[in-house]
Amino acid sequence: MKWINHIAIAGATTAIVAPTLVPVAVAGCTAPDWLEWLYKFVTGNKIRHRGATHYLSAWVLGLVFCLTLYDFHHIGAAFFYGGLTHIMADSFTVMGVPLSPWSDTRFHLFGGRLRTGESGEYLISWGIVGICILVGSFFSSYGGWYPFFYDWAGYYESGMIDASEWKANRFRLI
């Protein structure tokens, strides 16, 4: 899958649970690919794409480890969750992802019918984003706290800001 789709899936699914952890999950969702580049930079050896950095078992174990032991503000869990969303999204593709370093079996979801860059990839990822928007709007009340999207009209109505500040920021999303 393309990075934009990995970022969309990890960001949307994380925003429902913990909006403040979206940047960490986005860093984690791109990690399986940039870890390949980092390994090559550090050691000089190239590893195969969707190889050692794409082991499903490693990302699941990392997430379980962070969820069961002390994790400072769930930063580690968000990072490994982002990586796990990357692995799960790559499992939709024809190539699939390896289960573990000791297994030759590749993991596929829904038969692994997607090809990277084709329309099916975008339909699935943006469908997940749409579902997350619906779920998020259903479970959150109006005026809830979203750290990256400010409710300027609500702030003005409650008297928190004055009219000039509202006019200056009313069309600002972030």
Description of each model-found segment:
Residues M1-I174:
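N-terminal membrane-targeting hydrophobic helices
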